[in-house]
């Protein structure tokens, strides 16, 4: 596998960054799969004491939003609003907002963040 020629970003060449851009594009196209994988983890690794897993909670929230006629942005936000809970339980709201920010409206992002 090709690698960059630098150890500090400021020393990168045009060729380094062209190669990285192509590799990053490939990585970005797998975002949905990584989110799916994290949702599956939420079904397996949830906080004790609750009647349902974090995955079930997200699915219930998204289903309720969809049944209420919410647009896709709100349904996605309802599904993913706790996506950061496993890594950042004290500030998972901000983490979730940053994850969905490129894909949904600013209003939806703001609600998830706050």
Residue positions per predicted region:
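Metal-dependent phosphohydrolase cores
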Residues: 1-114
């Amino acid at each position: 596998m090709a690698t960059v020629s630098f150890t500090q970003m400021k020393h990168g060449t045009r060729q380094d960054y062209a190669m990285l851009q192509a590799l990053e594009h490939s990585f970005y196209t797998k975002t949905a799969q990584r989110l799916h994988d994290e949702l599956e983890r939420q079904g397996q690794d949830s906080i004790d004491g609750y009647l349902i897993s974090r995955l079930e909670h997200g699915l219930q929230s998204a289903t309720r939003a969809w049944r209420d006629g919410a647009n896709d942005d709100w349904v996605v936000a309802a599904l993913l609003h706790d996506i950061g809970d496993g890594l950042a339980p004290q500030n998972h709201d901000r983490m979730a907002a940053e994850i969905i920010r490129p894909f949904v409206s600013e209003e939806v992002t703001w609600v998830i963040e706050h």
